[in-house]
Amino acid sequence: MKVHEHQAKEIFRKYGLPVPRGYPAFDVKEAVEAAEELGTWPVVVKAQIHAGGRGKAGGVKLAKSIEEVQQIASELLGKKLATFQTGPEGLPVSRLYIEEATAIDKEFYVAITLDRSKSKPIIMVSAAGGMEIEEVAATNPEAIITQTIEPFIGLRSYHARELALKLGLPKNLLNKAASIFTTLYKIYIELDASMVEINPLVLTKDGNIVILDAKIEFDDNGLFRHPEIMEMDDPTQISPLEVEAKKFNLNYIKLDGNIACMVNGAGLAMSTMDTIKLAGGEPANFLDVGGSANATQIANAFKIILSDPNVKAIFINIFGGILRCDRLAEGIITAAKEVSINVPVIVRMEGTNVELGKKMLQESGLPLITADTMWEGALKAVEAANKQQ
């Protein structure tokens, strides 16, 4: 689960981290009141969406007067902001963050996340702050300094000081920077975060260090321990189809292609998407129905898939384990009775009760296209989608 910048900064404040003063605003009037409360000029008006690249997209602007705050707030609120992370459709701006401006000398990057290759947390720092870290990694990877964090030891002060030294921070700020790094790790662990990021952490012209932008992503599996964080969820920042999928415990992420996928297991789902790409197609979604899906959930998965007008074909790729193939077949038949399936459906099943599942589908009379392998299924899905164009 993602949260907005102003929510992440409020968490940072509670942990004693140096964050500029600022207030969220949900309408123009609140934006003006926030600027007046700050009482210093200029102020920064920031659109709040769950994506990076806001500055380049015009979502972060400097205001030098109340009139400018009103104008900028009116321009941003109620509109969609498109960045390189959102895609062309953008995300709705329903709130702003009004923050006191900071005189910047240097910008740095700091983040803690999970290194899946080592199954351990990792801290990344860079003197190339203010830029998108993906861009830095692609063009200047040596600019990113990383250190694996041993879970049984944690991030110690001497580790953090060494990282601050490598960043080239002034000696009088090494302890303060180290404290920021260790506190970030504390937040990462205590709040079950999957990523904590500061971009940028800035050295100000008066010789201080301040957090200018904050990002926290939380592990959904740990949210039951943090009801106060669950309340921060903003459903406007994800696709309505993703909101609907959550109601049925389906893992769904909308993509830009036209071949819908219905798969059990995240690994197989990603392999299926890769195979569709290799076959010349574009996946319309990631959809993991899980191992315990029943006929009702599968029917609801169909409804969600078919709600996407871009879908021209559906590729169902199931390896029957906990989710038996006959249960999948039952779900497909149930879905066909409840919704109008007006695009080609390609089915590839293997595993538990596969023969029974295939028999049920054959006897249903549904116009399904069958495949024996994932590659064959992907090729047939691409061919079927192209015919629908």
Curated annotation (Swiss-Prot):
Keywords: ATP-binding, Ligase, Magnesium, Metal-binding, Nucleotide-binding, Tricarboxylic acid cycle
Domain of life: Bacteria
MF terms (GO), sorted A to Z: ATP binding; magnesium ion binding; succinate-CoA ligase (ADP-forming) activity; succinate-CoA ligase (GDP-forming) activity
Positions bound to ATP: 46, 53-55, 99, 102, 107
SUPFAM superfamilies: Glutathione synthetase ATP-binding domain-like, Succinyl-CoA synthetase domains
Binding site for Mg(2+): 199, 213
Pfam families: ATP-grasp_2, Ligase_CoA
Quaternary structure and partners: Heterotetramer of two alpha and two beta subunits.
Protein name, UniProt field: Succinate--CoA ligase [ADP-forming] subunit beta
Organism for this UniProt entry: Sulfurihydrogenibium sp. (strain YO3AOP1)
Gene that specifies this protein: sucC
